[in-house]
Each structure stands twice: as C-alpha cells, then as structure tokens.
Amino acid sequence: MAFNMITFLQMAVFVVILFNINLHSASAGSKESSAHQSSDDSIKAEFCDAKCTMKTDGKWTQCHGGCFCVHVGNETEGRCMRLDGDYDYPSTQPEE
C-alpha cells in the first residue's frame, strides 16, 4: 500500500513538472508582446511655441491653446506643452 502511494505521488509531481515545462516553452516561443499597444490609444506630447515664466508673486504665466507650463526644479523659465491623445481624467464630481 505504501509503495503504491509513493509511486502515485511521484507520478503526480512528474506530471506537474511536465505541465509547467510545456506552459513555459509555449509562452517563451511567442514572438508577440503580451500587451498590444496601438498608436490609436497612445498619447502624444509636443511643445508649444510659447515659453512661460514665473512672476514675482510666484505664479506662472499662462500658456494658451490647450498648453500647460512645464518647468524643471527651481527654474524660473519653462516651456508650454500640449498633450494630445486618448486619455480620460477622473471627474472630481461624485458619480450618481
């Protein structure tokens, strides 16, 4: 009885190992990326023609044409940038 149980457990472990090897080899041979990214769903960032500067009161000058001000660190001059694409910001209003 004990011999049969040990043999059964060894066979079960062997089958599990073969199953894992088969799954790994099937996924490793795949040439496609796992998450398809289409250019239709991407976001395009581009700089606008204007620059923005920090005023003496600490506020930044406004960018126009759907652009916003981007600056690095403590710099007092930045560039206006626009994002185009399929993105959705969550609403600040509670859902009904």
Swiss-Prot record:
Single GO MF descriptor: C-X-C chemokine binding
Keywords: Disulfide bond, Glycoprotein, Secreted, Signal
Subcellular location: Secreted
Annotated disulfide bonds: 48-67, 52-69, 63-80
Sugar-modified residues: 74
Gene Ontology cellular component terms for the protein in this record: extracellular region
Main location: secreted
Signal peptide coordinates: 1-28
Protein's job: Salivary chemokine-binding protein which binds to host chemokines CXCL1 and CXCL8.
Protein known as: Evasin P1074
Protein species of origin: Ixodes ricinus
